[in-house]
Amino acid sequence: MAYRILTLSPGSTSTKVAVFEGEKTVMKSNVRHDPAELAGFDFARDQLQYRIDTVKAELAAAGVDLASIDAYSGYCGGMGPTVGGIFAIDQTVCDHVLNCGMNHPAILGAPILYQFAQETGKPAFAVNQPDTDELDDVARITGYPGVYRKSHVHCLNQKECAIRYADSLGKRYDEVNVIVAHVGGGLSVAAHRHGRMVDTNDVLEGSGPFAPNRSGDVPAKPVAQLAFSGEHSKQEVMGVIGKTGGLLGLLGTDDAIAINERIDAGDAWAKLVYEAMAYQTAKQIGAFAAALEGKVDGIVMTGGVSNDEGFVAYVERKVGWIAPVVAYGGDFEMEGAAAGAVRALEGTEDVMTYTGEPSWDGFHLDGAFADVEA
């Protein structure tokens, strides 16, 4: 049976909507919202009914009846750290995300899907939600007391690509070790060991390779000196770390196509900077090969920049000796959400009940809780 699955992903200025039926894409669109309309809402949570109405209008325009949908799935922000996998979206999930203190439309994913599920009597699922945290304890330690690493990566696309690669080997995701590098606006690399992301960089907190618009790892002292110099506000420093650093800060654009055009025209600085991003990506992959003790079945490049054959080829030259390198250019979040819903409906993957309890709340050593803040 080919299930019909509706998926969605609410973003800052748009909402992605897609409907899949088996291998067929019934519809897929990115609905742009009028900035003037968005400006009328004080908080992201206040946009809930507006986004519901917008999605319904888009579905109606595409001739899709909600009654034809077998299940709902999508990008569900605000759930906090959990293990990866599939969670049933219920009132507990919705209450948590709407009151989590996060002021970003990503928190509306679960409530929108739940509303549709309530209206039609069909299930709704959160698949590999963005705050998934499966790090090994040893990967959390830093040398700065009180600062511990957490996992913030492109989890839905990361895991979907790892699953696809495992399928290509005729194996299950929990049977392989894979390193996935998502290179888009942000850049996340993760070591997947037998179905768990046991080590990652953190695209929100500013670690790992620099990205098209994020700074990545930088020397700590110079940043501290900048922060306390009185010449830069907290917002300015945080902005470079998370929004205006990386390629954008160094080259004035985060468009890989435009940068390659500059390189082709002889721009030596653009070439060096772009190569440095590939170099750092390869270094992170190499580090995670060590985390997997060299037992790596494959390296997957994904995200928009992974459509650039030159970028992928550079990384492959650096790390191809570790394991085969394949590129799945673009992102597969919508497809991954749909595939997860199908696995839930078919019973090939367990569906978990969300409790709101974090997957990591500190270190538990010999039965004792280490006195740290999660």
Language model region names:
Residues 57-70, 168-172, 285-297:
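Phosphate/pyrophosphate-binding loops at sites that engage ATP/ADP/AMP, CoA/4′-phosphopantetheine
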